[in-house]
Amino acid sequence: MGYNKALRYSRHDGTSCVIDNHHLKSLGSVLNDVRHKKDRIREAEYEPILDIANQYMVTEDPFRGPGKNVRITLFKEIRRVQPDTMKLVCNWSGKEFLRETWTRFISEEFPITTDQEIMDLWFEIQLRPMQPNRCYKFTMQYALGANPEYVAHDVIRQQDPYYVGPNNMERINLSKKGFAFPLTCLQSVYNDNFERFFDDILWPYFHRPLVYVGTTSAEIEEIMIEVSLLFKIKEFAPDVPLFTGPAY
């Protein structure tokens, strides 16, 4: 007996025979629809918040935000680091800056020559191994909220440090929340009072970092340490119009 279309539905009331799956859905598709419905409900809840948030602009990385970066190289120095220990990079004392290994910011001129508004301050450290073909990583620990009268130890034991970032370079933001830097004439202040430049000018408005560096090597290693301060300077809009020509 061949297939007959008329036999798909029974003529008797209350009984039916479904042959095709046109009106059926898999359980997976049903669960997927439920998940999409939950996502739409969640998006509807966030829409008012997103409308307000879209009115503000923020940077994913504050270092790459608006402004001009001016670098001041404090020193370059070779130091020996014992295994399982970490050495203090600098204690920010005036006597330390007057050593022969520390030149006056490498150059005699302060790079910020005009009156500029300081927006941010970064501590940058670059580490390099002095011997070739050495397979170890650089480790680092730092503290920002130390008491000004606290005397930091020169050497500490490694305990839960973290690895220095890519290219063996690390940046630390020294800005204090709610503290604006009032001075704009940094060059004159630096030239007048170099020995007290940090204690009197910078640290009242920025964090004084205590930075320790070490290695994962099991031997004594000689490393090159380069320390810099990066000033984020506000770039003012030019006085001339941005567009010139017959249409303007």
Swiss-Prot record:
Origin: domain of life: Viruses
One Pfam family, short name: Polyhedrin
Gene Ontology terms for molecular function: structural molecule activity
Keyword entries, A-Z: Viral occlusion body
SS bond list: none
Annotated InterPro entries: Polyhedrin
GO terms under cellular component: viral occlusion body
Family stated for the protein in its record: Belongs to the polyhedrin family.
Stated role: Component of the virus occlusion bodies, which are large proteinaceous structures, that protect the virus from the outside environment for extended periods until they are ingested by insect larvae.
Protein name as catalogued: Granulin
Species assigned in the record: Choristoneura fumiferana granulovirus (CfGV)
Source lineage: Viruses, Viruses incertae sedis, Naldaviricetes, Lefavirales, Baculoviridae
